[in-house]
């Protein structure tokens, strides 16, 4: 049960972080992401072939994907832990949860005058699905290895 609570708390903290960022104004958000974009530029675009505003926008989109990837990992951990506790496999609940977070995230941005786009929901959801998929794959691989070791003894 400790794992269930730990993953639930991590997922809730990630949701608060995501929605907290969405509550920021355009200026606050740009001030926060500009230094990150500048520090990543020498690594991702060393010859500076991409225009600065385009690169900044790319980094902002990438940040959303990374945030939602992490959310997907935490939600998958919660679902796997809770499923083991309940002796059930939970698949649709985590998918609907991360989709709901993405939709609400864009809805919040509508009120902060940052604009809300369906493409951003799709991008966020894709990041979350990637996180869910990677985490589920790792959890099932871990269980498979664990079961093989138990049967080998």
Predicted regions and their residues:
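Short, charged juxtamembrane terminal tails flanking transmembrane helices
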Residues: 147-153
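Interfacial helix-loop-helix junctions of multi-pass membrane proteins
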Residues: 102-126
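Aromatic-anchored segments of alpha-helical transmembrane domains
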Residues: 15-23, 98-107
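Membrane-interfacial alpha-helical segments at the cytosolic side of multi-pass membrane proteins
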Residues: 68-82, 128-142
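Active-site alpha-helix of zinc metalloproteases
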Residues: 56, 60, 69, 97, ...
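"…centered on the first transmembrane helix and the immediately adjacent amphipathic helix/loop
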Residues: 1-69
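Internal alpha-helical transmembrane segments of multi-pass membrane proteins
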Residues: 83-96
